[in-house]
Amino acid sequence: MIEGYIHSIESMGLVDGPGIRTVVFFQGCRLRCRYCHNPDTWTMRSGKEQIFTPEQLVNKLLRFKPYFGDNGGVTFSGGEPLLQKDFLCEVLRLCKHAGIHTCIDTAGCGCGGYEEILAHTDLVLLDIKHFSLDGYHSITGQSPQEFLQFLSAV
């Protein structure tokens, strides 16, 4: 059974993609960005996370669908949603089947398998940390290799 670790869910997101959106903040991120807004999402298992199956999460999201109107939907953010690729992919697939617009707000630092994820994604908000290798490492503490792999998949 696939499970996902979710930090929190915001039901009235107005700045995380077009329209009125529900924002799902995933738990877990490998980066340690100097300016991170959500450092409490860094660890995958914080002890405070909510655990969902894909079906449970989508059933929760369906309750908000009437508020999305013609141009809203759901945005998956974090943390880094791409780190939970199997869970994310199944949630995206179920959302698309339910007619929910999908968006991923990501730094592009996951575990590969991006083509399948992107096949069920309507919009990607890609956080480009820096344009140089040294600058990227200085800000995130990591190499940009995984980011570049995701960028080529997009």
What is the predicted role of each segment?
Residues 8, 14-52:
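Canonical Radical SAM [4Fe-4S] cluster-binding loop centered on the CxxxCxxC motif
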Residues 44-66:
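Short hydrophobic interaction/assembly module
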Residues 1-18, 59-62:
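Auxiliary Fe-S-binding modules of radical SAM enzymes
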Residues 58, 62-66, 70-73, 78, ...:
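Conserved AdoMet/S-adenosylmethionine-binding subsite of the radical SAM
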